[in-house]
Curated annotation (Swiss-Prot):
Transmembrane segments: none
Domain of life of the source: Bacteria
Family assignment from sequence similarity: Belongs to the UPF0213 family.
Domain GIY-YIG positions: 5-80
One Pfam family from the record: GIY-YIG
Protein name: UPF0213 protein lmo0166
Cited InterPro entries: GIY-YIG_endonuc, GIY-YIG_endonuc_sf, UPF0213_domain
PANTHER family (alphabetical): UPF0213 PROTEIN YHBQ (PTHR34477:SF1)
CDD domains: GIY-YIG_UPF0213 (cd10456)
Length: 90
C-alpha cells in the first residue's frame, strides 16, 4: 500500500468503541500489528481494531502533527472531525 516515503496519520476504532490515532508509513501493516498486539499498549486490550480513517502527508512531521492534534480532541470533536473528513471525501 505504501512506499517508504509515504507518511500517514490513521485512526483505528477499537472493540470498546474508542479511537486510537497513530502515525505509520504502511497503514495495512500497522493495522495488522495492532491486531496482533504488537507495539501498542493501548490497543492490545481493545482488539480487534479497524482502520476507519487515514490521511497521507508529504512529511513525517506533518503526519505526526495531525496525530497529535487528533489526540488532543474530545470524543465529541473526534466524532465531528471524522464525519467532516468522510463528507469531504464523498
Amino acid at each position: 500500500m505504501a512506499k517508504a516515503s509515504e507518511h500517514f496519520f490513521y485512526v483505528l476504532k477499537c472493540s470498546d468503541n474508542s479511537y486510537y490515532g497513530g502515525y505509520t508509513t504502511d497503514v495495512l501493516r500497522r493495522e495488522a500489528e495492532h491486531n496482533a498486539g504488537i507495539r501498542c499498549k493501548y490497543t492490545k486490550t481493545r482488539r480487534p481494531v479497524k482502520v476507519i480513517h487515514f490521511e497521507k502527508f508529504e512529511t513525517r512531521s506533518e503526519a505526526t502533527k495531525a496525530e497529535a492534534a487528533f489526540k488532543k480532541l474530545s470524543r465529541k470533536n473526534k466524532d465531528a472531525y471524522l464525519i467532516q473528513r468522510e463528507e469531504e471525501s464523498e
